[in-house]
Design a protein with these regions (language model features):
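Thiamine diphosphate
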Residues: 1-180, 184
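Glycine-/acidic-rich phosphate or pyrophosphate-binding loops and their flanking alpha/beta elements
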Residues: 9-13, 168-180, 191-235
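Hydrophobic, well-ordered secondary-structure elements that form the walls
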Residues: 26, 80, 219, 236, ...
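Short, glycine/serine-rich, charged loops/turns that create anion-binding
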Residues: 31, 133, 187-188, 224-226, ...
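Short helix-loop-beta junction
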Residues: 56-63, 228-245
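Short beta->alpha junction loops
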Residues: 70-71, 247-251
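Active-site proximal loops enriched in glycine and acidic residues that flank catalytic Cys/His/Asp
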Residues: 185, 221-223, 247-248
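Single conserved hydrophobic/aromatic residue that forms the stacking wall/gate
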Residues: 250-259
């Protein structure tokens, strides 16, 4: 058991997936240091994306599997869908979920529909990692969550981890899944930490998590709102109301078994 931040847990899951499956690749803007990195030997992973989540991957696995892209989401999302349909397992980093509009056709009309269009025979095993949430004094176009934008599209699975345990286990499962998964990472949770088993296995998608037992009322929360759910439960306990708290981590499958 090791104390891990959400950021480090995601990095661990990426490394483990790369080591287990040679068909896993990663692409996105500045995930390997940005264009021109060749001039700065030893600093290829200096940035690792806007929040440093992919640091070390380029050095460890090389440029064939960890690829910086141009600022053209429509292009590299289309490339990822094609790669997924022909045997690879691409992980695409959409720098902020706010930029979903520039690659929405690719996700809504291609990735989400391919399995249905081919009678269930064609797989699209790809993961879109993207950052959501406000709280860093960023502009309005870098501060949204847009959960429902994706949950209303049949064919997409939307995963929203809360802590490091969820982040690692759910990302491992998402990468192994044969359908497109939108994996939403809340920027205000990256540096929060908890215990993570060193041998953590993939956590099945579609399972919520009971974080606190209670018998009177149930509070259901997503991502950072779990912090406030716990605070509310503490206040209710003071007036003898036993409160159960449930974290929903898969937003497109019902998790009523938790309630």
């Amino acid at each position: 058991m090791t104390i891990k931040t959400v950021k480090d847990a995601i990095n661990d899951a990426l490394v483990q997936s790369f080591e287990e499956d040679k068909n896993v690749i990663l692409m996105g803007e500045d995930i390997a240091g940005g264009k021109g990195r060749e001039q700065y030997q030893g600093t290829q992973d200096a940035w690792g994306g806007p929040f440093g989540v992919t640091q070390g991957l380029y050095t460890k696995f090389g440029g064939e599997r960890v690829r910086d892209t141009t600022i053209a989401e429509a292009g590299f999302f289309g490339a990822a869908i094609g790669a997924a349909m022909t045997g690879l397992r691409p992980i695409v980093e959409l720098m902020y979920v706010d930029f979903a509009g520039v690659c929405f056709d690719q996700m809504m009309n291609q990735a989400a529909k391919v399995r249905y269009m081919f009678g269930g025979k064609q797989k699209v095993p790809m993961v879109v990692r993207t950052v959501v949430g406000a709280g860093f004094r960023a502009g309005s176009e870098h501060s949204q969550t847009l959960y429902s934008l994706y949950t209303h599209i049949p064919g997409l699975k939307v995963v929203a981890p809360y802590d490091a345990y969820d982040a690692k286990g759910l990302l491992l499962s998402s990468i192994k899944d044969d359908d497109p998964v939108i994996f939403m990472e809340h920027k205000r949770l990256y540096m929060t930490s908890c215990e993570v088993p060193d041998d953590l296995k993939p956590i099945p998608l579609g399972k919520g998590r009971i974080r606190r037992e209670g018998s009177d009322v149930t509070i259901i929360a997503i991502q950072r709102m779990n912090l406030f759910a716990e605070e509310a439960a503490d206040e209710l306990e003071k007036i003898n109301i036993s409160c159960e708290t449930v974290s929903y981590t898969h937003l497109t499958l019902p998790t009523s078994h938790c309630v």
